């Protein structure tokens, strides 16, 4: 909130639910030794972020890890409470992680059917041992009017961010889409105010 009030950022993180995240052990059970934790926002956290966006004019980067989270997005969209300038990040995961849907056309189609008719910007993200660009999701998202996430946050053992962006640009160009950055991206997302730099 402090960064949004200062104008340093113009988007804030917005998770729409809580989900258990785990890594499967040799018996096919998530955690605990292999890793298991709860992630997300509880209802009071959601209301706090909604109020922060309303008070500051910040947009929101809205995470969707499970279908129930997308139901929450739809409910907020119908209630008119999704912050202006928001974008959905629909996450998928490899078979090694006990969370999210697999990176398939059918899974993406299911999520998109839930938001059919709603004016929502969206992207796909992928957590796994390879890049989202090594799955069908990257191209499918572009063909369906969305976008995809790249970077070391989702693929920590991958190539550099610069190399991932170069590859992403090639995929985007191959389907006839354009890359937008800076002010154009802010306009595309309809974020109420431009990003600023911290005061010197």
Can you say where each PLM-predicted feature lies in the sequence?
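Soluble catalytic regions of large protease machineries
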Residues: 141, 153-156, 172
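Hydrophobic/aromatic-rich structural module bridging two neighboring secondary-structure elements via a short loop
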Residues: 1-4
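C-terminal helical cap(s) of enzyme catalytic domains, especially alpha/beta-barrels
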Residues: 22-24, 29-33, 158-177
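Extended ligand-binding groove/face enriched in aromatic
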Residues: 7
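A generic structural signal for well-ordered alpha-helical surface patches
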Residues: 109, 139, 143, 162-170, ...
């Amino acid at each position: 909130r402090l960064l949004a009030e200062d104008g340093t950022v113009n988007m804030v993180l917005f998770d729409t639910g809580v989900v258990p995240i785990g890594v499967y052990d040799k018996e096919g059970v998530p955690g605990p030794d292999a890793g298991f934790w709860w992630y997300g926002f509880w209802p009071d956290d959601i209301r706090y972020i909604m109020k922060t966006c309303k008070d500051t004019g910040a947009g929101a980067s809205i995470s969707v890890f499970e279908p129930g989270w997308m139901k929450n997005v739809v409910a907020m969209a119908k209630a008119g409470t999704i912050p202006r300038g928001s974008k959905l990040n629909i996450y998928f995961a490899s078979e090694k992680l006990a969370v999210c849907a697999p990176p398939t056309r059918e899974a993406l189609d299911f999520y998109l059917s839930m938001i059919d008719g709603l004016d929502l910007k969206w992207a796909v993200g992928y957590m796994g041992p390879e890049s989202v660009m090594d799955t069908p999701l990257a191209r499918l998202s572009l063909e369906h009017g969305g976008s995809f996430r790249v970077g070391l946050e989702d693929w920590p053992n991958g190539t550099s961010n610069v190399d991932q962006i170069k590859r992403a640009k090639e995929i985007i160009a191959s389907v006839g889409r354009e890359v937008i950055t800076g002010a154009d991206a802010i306009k595309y997302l309809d974020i109420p105010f431009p990003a600023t730099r911290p005061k010197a």
